[in-house]
Swiss-Prot record:
Mg(2+) 2 binds at residues 215, 217. Its cofactor is Mg(2+). Residues 268-410 are annotated as: Disordered. It holds the Pfam family Toprim_4. GO terms for biological process: DNA replication, synthesis of primer. This is DNA primase DnaG. RNA polymerase that catalyzes the synthesis of short RNA molecules used as primers for DNA polymerase during DNA replication. Residues 167-241 form the Toprim domain. It comes from Halorubrum lacusprofundi (strain ATCC 49239 / DSM 5036 / JCM 8891 / ACAM 34). Forms a ternary complex with MCM helicase and DNA. Residues 349-376, 384-402 have a biased composition (Acidic residues). Coiled coil: none annotated. One of its GO terms (cellular component) is primosome complex. The lineage of its organism: Archaea, Methanobacteriati, Methanobacteriota, Stenosarchaea group, Halobacteria. InterPro entries: DnaG_primase, Primase_DnaG_arc, TOPRIM_DnaG/twinkle, TOPRIM_dom.
Length: 505
């Protein structure tokens, strides 16, 4: 009946005496029987489930009984009203006089509608899940999924997708550090997952260029010492003191990696973190021509005089190169951090050849000078002013730098690029000329150079192929007329156009 009831008849009863529930039910059936005819007989209606169970609640007090009767009906509105009126004809309950008064006829469907409305209000207020995402939330969610999908399993350790085939790897502490580097575009990181360095990582360091990038705390130092004992470490970089790699932003990550130092210079230090921080401060090229190792070759007397003559120009050029190179590197996409140290030895045979060539040139120049001097003596007798002009000319010739003497980057750029020479020049740490070749042969020259150049100036396009071989040989700077599109851009090699150099952009 619960499923089909439409109305509920509520009636109050009062009896002059003590009565029970069974007395009330008997009075309802007995005194309404035959009153409304066969179609509305209460017993027949109940048997056909058109009228539900009669609920009675009665209490007795001071010799009188009071209560409430509830009858469920699935009849229509008119028939239900007739049935309710029939209940009021009851005047006796058991042996006692009684009265029945219908107080209300409740529409069950209306009650259900009220419940539906109230529940709907509750659902609207808090029943719905947040389905509308802001644009930033969507981007963050997709980026997070991309970062997680980028992690691969290398011998049971979390790693970037390039660890297996890259010739350089970055060793970090945990999975979160690998995620941070992936977010920065660095895909060749592998995690040791604790201070106990796994054998897989130790084996990996045997034939790769390894950079340990660790937290700036005691734990990072312990991992470095353990890694150095079981494997080979080439470079070391630490997060800022008290910070973890996983908490660093993109700029701080690249700043820390640029400041990496060779582990061989730290191996005997009692505090590796402080030593690494001190050494990284002198890593960039300064205005005096020092290399990345911070050492400076002893200049000859003639070189010293030449540098004094062009000190102002050199300082400005070095500052432009440093600032421009940093911004150019920041704009690039980093696929993997690869920085192979340059060989330090200089081939003696190459120096001898250069010396012989220069000696031959000097002899021919000397012969020409003797002839010119004889001609000049004849003219000088007629024109005394020629003496002063000759003195000035000799001063200019003395001040002009030799081809392999150190000079500013700007001078090399003017001689190679501005002159439209279609040539390339390989420069050493002191900006002296190591070799000069056709621009199309720059790749082979860098690859085959006995001494890896510090800087290469090219009158032409710097493409991915040239950048790759420069990074492999440890070239610090590449300067060209224009720069092509790069798929990956190693951190250790700065790439600038002549325009970038002069604008400082």
């Amino acid at each position: 009946m619960k499923d089909t009831e439409k109305y509920l008849i509520h009636a109050n009863i009062a009896a002059d005496g003590v009565v029970e529930r069974s007395d009330v039910v008997g009075a309802v059936f007995g005194q309404t029987e035959g009153l409304l005819g066969d179609e509305l007989d209460l017993r027949d209606l109940q048997e056909s489930s058109r009228v539900g169970r009669i609920d009675v609640a009665v209490e007795s007090e001071n010799g009188q009984s009071f209560g409430e009767v509830t009858v469920a009906s699935s009849l229509d509105k008119v028939e239900t009203a007739i049935l309710a009126a029939a209940l009021e004809t009851i005047d006796r309950i058991g042996p006692c006089h009684a009265s029945v008064e219908v107080t209300s006829i409740e529409d069950v469907r209306a009650a259900k509608r009220r419940e539906v409305v109230e529940r709907a209000k509750e659902l609207v207020a808090g029943g719905f899940e947040e389905t509308s995402l802001a644009s930033d939330d969507i981007l963050d969610e997709v980026r997070e999924a991309a970062r997680v999908e980028g992690i691969v399993d290398y011998e049971g350790l979390p790693a970037g997708p390039r660890v297996g085939d890259s010739d350089a790897v970055i060793v970090v502490e945990g999975r979160a550090d690998v995620l941070t580097l992936l977010e920065c575009g660095i895909k060749n990181a592998v995690a040791v997952e604790g201070t106990n360095v796994p054998d897989a990582v130790a084996d990996l360091t045997a034939d790769r260029t390894v950079t340990a990038f660790l937290d700036g705390d005691r734990g990072g130092e312990l991992i470095l010492r353990e890694l150095a004992q079981v494997g080979d470490v080439d470079y070391v970089a630490f997060a800022p003191p008290g910070e973890s790699v996983e908490d660093l932003d993109r700029n701080t990550v690249f700043e820390a990696l640029r400041g990496k130092v060779p582990y061989s210079s730290l191996a005997d230090e009692p505090n590796l973190r402080e030593a690494a921080t001190d050494d990284s401060g002198s890593a960039p090229i300064d205005n005096e021509g020092r290399g990345r190792s911070g050492e400076m070759s002893e200049p000859s007397e003639s070189e010293t005089e030449s540098e004094r003559a062009s000190d102002g120009g050199d300082d400005g050029d070095a500052g432009v190169v440093a600032g421009g190179a940093r911004s150019a590197t920041d704009r690039g996409l980093v696929d993997a951090v690869e920085d192979t140290p340059a060989p330090a030895a200089t081939d003696a045979g190459e120096v001898d050849e250069v010396g012989e060539d220069r000696e031959g040139d000097m002899e021919s120049d000397s012969d020409t000078a003797d002839i010119n001097d004889a001609e000049f003596d004849d003219r000088a007798a007629d024109d005394p002013n020629l003496d002063e002009a000759a003195d000035a000319e000799s001063v200019e010739e003395t001040d002009a730098p030799l081809d392999n003497e150190p000079r500013s980057i700007e001078e090399h750029v003017q001689e190679i690029v501005d002159a439209g020479s279609d040539r390339a020049r390989l420069l050493g740490d002191d900006r002296g000329v190591l070799a000069e070749i056709d621009a199309v042969d720059a790749f082979d020259a860098i690859e085959d150079a006995e001494t890896a150049p510090h800087t290469v100036v090219v009158d032409g396009l710097i493409d991915q192929r040239l950048l790759d071989v420069a990074a492999q040989r440890g070239v610090s700077e590449l300067l060209g007329r224009e720069v092509g599109e790069f798929v990956k851009r190693p951190v250790g090699t700065r790439v600038l156009t002549v325009g970038d150099l002069r604008t400082g952009s």
